[in-house]
């Protein structure tokens, strides 16, 4: 069960395109772990986060111990997991668990605006940047920089790089990348 859940969440985490979680209401246990598998988390002001598993006699099983510590630091992750206490959206933003908190009525509009902003950029470059961040976090700083340099170099073999640089030099605002 835990292995299958982790496989699903890793697929989300390593999916080529950025994944944005829109959290409205409770994200506890697996729900919190699902949100942490996403690249960006936007929460409604009524959202509640937590890893309550130890109160049930189990540990987080879908990457919660690993992702939470990477997102908020080991000390806060241990406090949240060991106490099994839930936190509100504002606290989640303060500790870095979520990127942004908005009014519930504005949640989907905010997430869609963010997604459209990402989609305006070169898809290949965004995917390479995501890969560099994710893989770089699995190694030391020198290894991470080597990954970044590799992904950066690959961009120069794309039509989007040539087009993007040309648009910059010619001050073109409305770019239409080809994903090539």
Stretch-by-stretch model annotation:
Residues 1-24, 71:
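An acidic, glycine-rich surface segment that forms the CoA-thioester-binding/catalytic face
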Residues 11-21, 40, 44-48, 125:
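A structural preference for short, pocket-lining loop segments at secondary-structure junctions
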Residues 18, 35, 68, 92, ...:
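Terminal peptide-recognition signature
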Residues 31-41, 45-46, 88-91, 95-97:
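Active-site-proximal glycine-rich helix-loop-beta segment
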Residues 40, 79, 83-85, 91, ...:
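Well-ordered beta-strand positions
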Residues 42-47, 98-146, 150-159, 176-180:
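C-terminal long alpha-helix characteristic of the crotonase
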Residues 66-75:
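Hydrophobic, secondary-structure "cap" segments at the distal end of domains
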Residues 166-180:
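Terminal low-complexity tails and localization/encapsulation signals of metabolic enzymes
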